[in-house]
Every structure is written in structure tokens, then in C-alpha cells.
């Protein structure tokens, strides 16, 4: 690791906790060593076969009529109730072990004070530190349960991992870092290295306590501070707490009879065990979601037999991966603001599929539009716009289903791989090698629709009376969506946790960033949070800007705390509910986006669109009406001393 400009001089022993002689601040050296050099890989490959990089045209007369709508409903209803997941506790707790780092660095427990404590060390935390530092906030501390930075890119290091948003728009601070991604769609391994370089350059490692899981955070009304308890015995006090631990952080395991009896080796994709040699082995993978779509082609290249157990097929769209060209790097080097301009152009695209394809001509500014906008004789009502989107989505899905027929040779396998739900209802996937994998003689799709795998034995997986013998079993069963465990351990003014408040009265926030009764708490990228659309890091840009703005506002007013009025929260929650209900036909399937069909409207993601979210944010910042500022910063500072 290179030293950062902020690093204090340390002794030869480089203690885990030291004091900066210039400022008196505590600095840390708790970054864990990499567990093994075998943890390495790549993402999408560039494919030369043009037939694999284009979708067939939609069939003539394709229309989302009553017959097709009934087919979609039957596809959905046949799977209702099939999603059954369990907590990773007891004998299943091992699936959460950190397999990527050496054991935690030993350190003493901390019981001191800081101004800002942030939970997480992914892009949200890295961006926030960059901006806080620039704004003059330096008494900032981070807690991260993993052994290094990266967030989702730390935990997800499976073979084939890559980002589905183009790297030129996804990676933050590209110009500041002087970095050009090697591929249009960067691999997770490259993204992790980029996170590490960011952390080194801006002194993040000195501020972060790694292998430190926050277990409980309690508000002290008398002192206007949070007390943060961790699994390392810490009881740190902070004026402000920021949740920056992401939206897909808790892995899920499907509840399957007999899974504990499996005699072979098994692991979850978010804890990929690189000590397990897969070459020449019989391997099974349960799941065909976004992760499995990236994993399967890589497994197919090395294993002896591969069994892919699928309950619900994904949409397998064209990826068309390519390397960054020397000409692009030369052009961008001469073009100040190139990355920001590209990111903002991406944000103007309203179609998720178009945004995720990343049209280079449009994003580079060579053309004014990706394609001509369709014009209607009159302005459509919101309901008519939804119906128009459904019709467009249906034609795209027809093309995606036609692609399956064009690529997969076995008709039975092809039929099982065709999805029947609105495009984007489940997370879209992109790959040019996934479908061809099922033409290989040693790769077998086991169609477990509609209810999924129900039995595992010591020898392997059983379905329809057939036992599939396995040496290794991989669970690609995904993550809980916006269900971070942090919500269970944040205790606010009335003694309730955030989870208890939301369970009793429904999810209620203001902008997704505040919740009434939890002063000086900021929730980044949580339920009802908006502003980002399809590029997650653009949302983080907005959220981090907001947190810095609020801290500067509190400092300027000399206030100790900020909370939200109950009325502002109720109005925003109602807006989130209305936006969800209006657009719900676009998500008429069972997926983690809607809690497998069980989530209350407005309780998860924000569906009002980035423009509406920013409109509400700007109005709040201009008027300050939704906020309740109390106390004086001097009193809090005295209490901290």
C-alpha cells in the first residue's frame, strides 16, 4: 500500500491505533492482508461473434395483448410463495465468514468521541470522506465489517464479476484520480483495486476500523450523541452517524431440506472460496440471477460437469464488451470534465435498458439522442405512459426470448430459459457467453420451476426424483434488498429501533436520508432514497453532497442536532407510495424489488424518478421547513470533552 498524503509518521511496529502528533487525532492501521493470492479473476470477455452481440428483430405484430398478459400472470402466480430464505445462523453462519482477508488486526477497544462515524467502506463512504475532507470535516471515523475497502466489490469476488453500468460513468472521481478503466464494463476485480487506490490516495485507511461490525447504536438525548457499540468491544460516541453500508449487503440462503447434510464443499457466491479447486469437479450452482449469469460461463470453462439449477430465468441481454481504446484515452486526456459530462448524459436516459447498454456516441456527445423520441398526437396521461412502456417492454422481451431460440440448440433447454415478465421487473442481466454455455456437453440446465430446489442429500441435489451427484455446491441465491441489519440496531429517541418503527407504522423517511425520531442520523442509499436512477454511484454523489451540505448548515447555525418534522416525513412517505403504485404494472412479477410480492407500496426503492426526488430535495434545502434544528454545538462539544 502506498502512503497517503494524510498519513502520520508511525513507529517501526506500526501499531493498529496511533495518535497524529500534529492534530492529536487517532489514526488506524487495521487493513487486513489478503487471504490468498489465488483471489483473482476477470469480468466480461470481449466476444467477436456478431451473432452473439445482437438481438433478433421483434416478431411482426408483437403486442402485449390479453393472451400475453394472462401468460405473464400465470408465470408469476405459479411461483408465488416459492421464495423461502433463512437466516445464516448456527451451522449456516460459516457462509458469512470473511474468506478474503487474513484474521483481523488486533487492537484495543475504543471508548472515545468523534464528530462523524460512518458505517461502511464502499463507494459511498469513500466519496463521503473525499467531500468531508475537502469541506474541513476531519474528525471522521469509519467502521467496516470486512478487511478492506470496496463494499459490494469486496464481498463479491466470484469468477466473471463485472459491473453492468459502463465504467466510464460508474466509477467516481475518474478525473481526479487520473484513471481510465481498461474495459467499458469493468470487472469487479478492477473496481476493487480502484477503491483501494482511492483509499490510499485520500488517507481513508487512516480513518477506518476494519473487521469491525457495528452491533448497536443508541441515541443519548442528554448529550445529543450516538453511542456506537461494535463486536470489538468499542463504545464510541459520535455527534453524527451515517449509514453507508449499501442496499445489497446481507446474503440470502434458500431454505432447502437436507442442505446441512451435503458432504461436499459449499459456499455462497458472496464468499467465493478460492481455496476450493474446481478444475475437473462436478459442480452445481443454485440460482440463475444476475450473479449466476456471470459465474456460469467461467465455471463452464474449468469444471468437469456443471449443473445449473434454475427456478426463474433471467433476461439475458446483449453485453457487447470491449476494451478502452488508446484513441479514447487520448481524447479524454484533452477534455476536462469528460467523466462528469458522460455521467450526466447517462442520467438523462429514461429507459433502463438503453442506459445499461451505454451508447458510446450519445454518451460521448457525438449525437444528441440515442434514438428519435416517439411523438404522440397529444400528451399522454401517466397511466397511458405506463401502458406504452409495457408495450415497448414486451417487444424487447420478445427479442430476448428469440435470442434464446437463436443461440441454445436444445429446444427443451431453450424453452426453460425464456422469461415471461416485464423487462426490468427482475434485475436485467447482460452476457454474450451465458446462453452458449448450455450448448456445451458438460453443462446441464435443471429446470426446477416453479418452486425451486426442495431437497439436498449428502451426495448432491435431488429434483423430480433424480439425484445430481456433486463435489461442490455453489449458492447463487442473492441478497436481501434494502434490508441491512443496521436498521435492527439503531435505537432512536423513543427507545425503538428503526426497524421497529417501520414495522409498526410502515417505512417512513424524508428523502430516504432522515427518519423522524432519529436525529443526526443519515441513511445513504436506503429505502425511499432517490436521485440515482440506473447508475448507483450517481445517487451516491447526490446523497454525499446532501450530507456534507447538512453538516455545513448545522455548523453555520451553531445547532447541535437536526431531525425531521413528522408532517414532512408523512408527506414524503405518501409520495413514495403513490409513485410506487403508479408504476407498479412495470414490476408485475415476483422479485427482490418488491419483496417477492410482499412489500408494501413505497417501502423499498423510490419510483418517483430522479427529477422529482431532486425537486423535493432542492425545495427542502431552500426553505428548511422540513427540518428541526435544536441545541447548540458548544454544549455538545463540552459534553464530548
Task: Give the residues covered by each predicted segment.
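Glycine-rich NAD(P)-binding loop of Rossmann-like domains
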Residues: 276-283
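Flexible, glycine/small-residue-enriched loop-and-beta-strand segment within the central core
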Residues: 271
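Ligand/cofactor pocket segment of small-molecule handling proteins
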Residues: 296
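Class I S-adenosylmethionine-dependent transferase superfamily signal
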Residues: 299
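N-terminal FAD-binding dinucleotide-binding subdomain shared by FAD-dependent oxidases/monooxygenases
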Residues: 2-116, 121, 130-260, 275, ...
Amino acid at each position: 500500500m502506498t502512503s497517503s498524503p494524510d498519513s502520520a509518521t508511525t513507529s517501526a511496529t506500526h501499531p493498529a491505533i496511533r495518535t497524529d502528533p500534529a492534530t492529536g487525532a487517532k489514526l488506524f492501521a487495521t487493513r487486513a492482508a489478503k487471504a490468498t493470492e489465488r483471489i483473482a479473476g476477470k469480468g466480461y470477455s470481449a466476444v467477436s461473434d456478431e451473432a452473439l452481440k445482437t438481438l433478433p428483430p421483434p416478431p411482426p405484430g408483437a403486442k402485449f395483448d390479453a393472451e400475453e398478459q394472462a401468460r405473464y400472470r400465470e408465470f408469476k402466480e405459479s411461483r408465488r410463495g416459492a421464495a423461502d430464505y433463512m437466516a445464516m445462523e448456527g451451522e449456516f453462519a460459516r457462509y458469512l465468514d470473511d474468506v478474503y482477508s487474513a484474521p483481523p488486526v488486533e487492537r484495543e477497544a475504543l471508548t472515545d468521541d468523534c464528530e462523524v462515524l460512518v458505517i461502511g467502506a464502499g463507494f459511498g463512504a469513500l466519496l463521503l470522506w473525499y467531500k468531508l475532507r475537502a469541506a474541513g470535516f476531519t474528525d471522521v471515523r469509519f467502521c467496516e465489517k470486512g478487511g478492506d475497502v470496496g463494499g459490494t466489490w469486496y464481498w463479491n469476488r466470484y469468477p466473471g464479476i463485472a459491473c453492468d453500468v459502463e465504467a466510464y460513468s460508474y466509477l467516481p472521481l475518474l478525473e481526479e484520480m487520473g484513471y481510465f478503466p481498461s474495459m467499458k464494463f469493468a470487472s469487479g476485480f478492477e473496481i476493487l483495486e480502484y477503491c483501494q487506490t482511492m483509499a490510499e490516495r485520500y488517507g481513508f485507511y487512516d480513518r477506518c476500523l476494519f473487521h469491525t461490525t457495528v452491533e448497536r447504536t443508541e441515541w443519548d438525548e442528554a448529550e445529543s450523541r450516538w453511542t456506537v457499540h461494535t463486536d470489538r468491544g468499542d463504545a464510541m460516541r459520535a455527534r453524527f452517524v451515517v449509514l453507508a453500508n449499501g442496499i445489497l449487503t446481507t446474503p440470502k440462503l434458500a431454505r432447502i431440506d437436507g442442505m446441512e447434510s451435503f458432504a461436499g464443499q459449499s459456499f455462497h457466491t458472496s464468499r467465493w472460496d478460492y481455496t476450493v479447486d474446481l478444475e475437473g469437479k462436478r459442480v452445481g450452482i443454485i440460482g440463475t440471477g444476475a450473479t449466476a449469469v456471470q459465474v456460469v460461463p467461467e465455471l463452464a470453462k474449468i469444471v468437469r460437469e456443471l449443473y445449473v439449477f434454475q427456478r426463474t430465468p433471467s433476461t439475458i441481454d446483449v453485453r457487447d464488451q470491449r476494451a478502452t481504446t488508446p484513441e479514447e484515452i487520448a481524447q479524454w486526456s484533452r477534455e476536462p470534465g469528460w467523466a462528469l459530462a458522460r455521467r450526466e448524459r447517462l442520467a438523462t436516459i429514461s429507459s433502463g435498458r438503453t442506459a445499461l447498454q451505454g451508447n458510446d456516441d450519445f454518451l460521448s456527445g457525438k449525437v444528441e439522442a440515442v434514438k428519435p423520441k416517439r411523438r404522440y398526437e397529444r400528451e399522454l396521461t401517466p397511466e397511458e405512459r405506463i401502458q406504452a412502456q409495457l408495450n415497448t417492454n414486451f417487444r424487447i422481451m420478445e427479442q430476448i426470448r428469440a435470442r434464446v431460440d437463436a443461440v441454445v440448440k436444445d429446444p427443451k433447454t431453450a424453452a426453460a430459459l425464456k422469461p415471461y415478465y416485464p423487462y426490468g421487473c427482475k434485475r436485467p442481466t447482460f452476457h454474450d457467453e451465458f446462453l452458449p454455455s448450455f450448448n456445451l456437453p458438460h453443462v446441464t440446465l435443471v429446470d426446477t420451476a416453479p418452486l425451486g430446489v426442495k431437497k439436498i442429500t449428502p451426495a448432491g441435489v435431488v429434483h423430480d426424483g433424480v439425484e445430481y451427484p456433486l463435489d461442490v455446491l455453489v449458492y447463487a441465491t442473492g441478497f436481501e434488498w434494502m434490508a441491512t441489519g443496521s436498521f435492527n440496531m439503531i435505537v432512536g429517541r423513543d427507545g425503538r429501533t428503526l426497524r421497529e418503527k417501520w414495522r409498526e407504522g410502515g417505512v417512513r423517511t424524508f428523502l430516504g436520508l432522515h427518519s423522524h425520531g432519529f436525529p443526526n442520523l443519515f441513511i445513504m442509499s436506503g429505502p425511499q432514497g432517490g436521485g440515482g436512477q440506473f447508475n448507483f454511484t450517481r445517487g451516491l454523489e447526490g446523497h454525499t453532497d446532501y450530507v456534507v451540505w447538512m453538516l455545513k448548515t448545522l455548523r453555520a447555525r451553531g445547532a447541535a442536532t437536526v431531525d425531521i418534522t413528522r408532517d414532512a416525513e408523512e408527506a414524503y412517505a405518501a409520495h413514495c407510495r403513490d409513485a410506487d403504485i403508479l408504476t407498479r404494472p412495470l414490476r408485475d412479477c415476483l422479485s427482490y424489488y418488491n419483496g417477492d410480492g410482499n412489500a408494501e407500496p413505497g417501502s423499498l426503492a423510490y419510483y418517483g424518478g430522479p427529477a422529482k426526488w431532486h425537486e423535493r430535495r432542492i425545495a427542502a434545502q431552500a426553505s428548511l421547513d422540513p427540518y428541526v434544528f435544536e441545541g447548540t454545538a458548544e454544549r455538545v462539544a463540552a459534553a464530548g470533552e
